[in-house]
């Protein structure tokens, strides 16, 4: 039995039926029960969404920046008024603890919308004199219609991260949420409409990425793709975007991020950071610090401190106020994480805690995996090399700074990195040598609206959040003006 009615598409300011005649089911990962059936967009539906966006964008771009700013600020007010309602739906769909979704997902996403609402009026060009009778100026103009393709771990937050700068700059967006967690994107679209965003400026099309995502990346009207997901899919999106019409792309992809504990670090602080960097959101965070490098001299003490903290994690019904660790977001993903755990055991890593499903009582019905910590890990182990995207920490011993920097950088990923040390000069020195786009010293994981997010190497292209992102949703037009006579050479 489903909990919610059939979920439609959202095109031109209203919910509309898809024309494909197909649906898919979205499942509550805490119980295995179907939440809703979701309609799948056809190619004709995607075309309708793009054309609607093209029409709406012209209306939106013709407004003054101050008008757009006021409308986005009103959307922020509505988001905050409905925080608990949206958080409840997000928990139902993702399995994340309600204690997390009520304080992080909508709250921080709304912060990003508010941030870009404030910047909408600050988009400006330059003017420079060339000589007494001539000068040039530049204009930053919106790209037009852009597409956002979201991930399943932070559905509504990612939708806001992608749409806020796009809309602030005067663009329209066609957004495709993950088919694993599709429910809150339409609620966001309705809030934008209620706030006064013109019809068509934020449309939502549902369905599998291999179809909907491909149609969006190849569409000649779409000028930019913002994608969050895996590396392999990201490469396909980038190739498709380039082959169709040389679209600009922004990609936040995978990670296998190092957390370096220095020998002068406070043990309790280091253990607290390591546990947060691995088990927040049940380990389903792109920036997780899953490779924890610890000085050999403090390895035993660090292991004990981490295990002590893991035992305090409260696994349970994500709707319960006391729960701070819910199920993984889907059953197929749970099976994948369990395979990685078994590979860690088979390749000789020493299991300190966890190592399988949580099956006590009602937990057996959900996609629960115990917080898992391995030690005696080697750089060539599968659990150390590949992104697991689950609650699995790998502890690696090291002997000196040069060694740990070399090993930390020995990866195709470069999303995040962190250092824990009482010596701030030392921490800066190590951070500056690490090949990662998002770094933390003596903390982990916070991504404020003002801070650019993105990776090095195969972890991504471009950035989300921060001032510079706004520029990537505009294009520069240069205009020269001649005030004097024009002298032809002919």
UniProtKB/Swiss-Prot annotation:
The gene is betB. The record marks 248 as: Seems to be a necessary countercharge to the potassium cations. The lineage of its organism: Bacteria, Pseudomonadati, Pseudomonadota, Gammaproteobacteria, Lysobacterales. Keywords: Metal-binding, NAD, NADP, Oxidation, Oxidoreductase, Potassium. This is Betaine aldehyde dehydrogenase. Its cofactor is K(+). K(+) 1 binds at residues 26, 93, 180. Its EC number is 1.2.1.8. One of its GO terms (biological process) is glycine betaine biosynthetic process from choline. Involved in the biosynthesis of the osmoprotectant glycine betaine. Catalyzes the irreversible oxidation of betaine aldehyde to the corresponding acid. K(+) 2 binds at residues 246, 457, 460.
């Amino acid at each position: 039995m489903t909990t919610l009615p059939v979920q439609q598409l959202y095109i031109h300011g209203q919910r509309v039926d898809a024309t494909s005649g197909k649906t898919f089911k979205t499942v509550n990962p805490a119980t295995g029960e179907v939440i809703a059936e979701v309609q799948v967009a056809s190619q004709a539906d995607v075309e309708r969404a793009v054309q609607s966006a093209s029409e709406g964008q012209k209306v939106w771009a013709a407004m003054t920046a101050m008008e757009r700013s006021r409308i986005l600020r009103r959307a922020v007010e509505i988001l905050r008024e409905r925080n608990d309602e949206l958080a409840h739906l997000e928990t139902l769909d993702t399995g994340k603890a309600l204690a997390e979704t009520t304080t992080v997902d909508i709250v921080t996403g709304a912060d990003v919308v508010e941030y870009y609402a404030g910047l909408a009026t600050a988009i400006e060009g330059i003017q420079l004199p060339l000589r007494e009778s001539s000068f040039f100026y530049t204009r930053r103009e919106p790209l037009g219609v852009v597409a956002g393709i979201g991930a399943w771990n932070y559905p509504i937050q990612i939708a806001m991260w992608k749409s806020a700068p796009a809309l602030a700059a005067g663009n329209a967006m066609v957004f495709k949420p993950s088919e694993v967690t599709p429910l809150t994107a339409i609620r966001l679209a309705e809030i934008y409409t209620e706030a006064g965003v013109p019809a068509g400026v934020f449309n939502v099309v549902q369905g599998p990425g291999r179809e909907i995502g491909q149609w969006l990346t190849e569409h000649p009207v779409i000028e930019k793709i913002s994608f969050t997901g895996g590396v392999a899919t990201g490469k396909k999106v980038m190739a498709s975007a380039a082959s169709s019409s040389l679209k600009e792309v922004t990609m936040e992809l995978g990670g296998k991020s190092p957390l370096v504990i220095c020998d002068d670090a406070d043990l309790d602080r280091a253990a607290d950071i390591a546990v947060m960097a691995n088990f927040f959101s049940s380990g389903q965070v792109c920036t997780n610090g899953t490779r924890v490098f610890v000085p050999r001299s403090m390895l035993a003490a660090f292991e004990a401190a981490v295990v002590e903290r893991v035992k305090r994690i409260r696994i349970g019904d994500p709707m319960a106020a006391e729960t701070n660790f819910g199920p993984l977001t889907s059953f197929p993903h749970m099976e994948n994480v369990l395979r990685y755990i078994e590979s860690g055991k088979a390749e000789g890593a020493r299991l300190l805690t966890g190592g399988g499903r949580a099956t006590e009582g009602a937990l057996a019905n959900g996609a629960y995996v115990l917080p898992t910590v391995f030690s005696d890990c080697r750089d060539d182990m599968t659990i150390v090399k590949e992104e697991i995207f689950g609650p699995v920490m790998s502890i690696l011993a090291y002997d000196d700074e040069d060694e740990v920097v070399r090993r930390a950088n020995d990866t195709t990923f470069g999303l995040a990195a962190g250092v824990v040390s009482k010596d701030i000069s030392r921490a800066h020195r190590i951070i500056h040598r690490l090949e990662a786009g998002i770094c933390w010293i003596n903390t982990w994981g916070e991504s404020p609206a003002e801070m650019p997010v993105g990776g090095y190497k195969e972890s991504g292209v471009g950035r989300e959040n921060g001032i510079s992102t706004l520029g990537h949703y505009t294009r520069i037009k240069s205009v020269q003006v001649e005030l004097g006579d024009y002298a032809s050479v002919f």
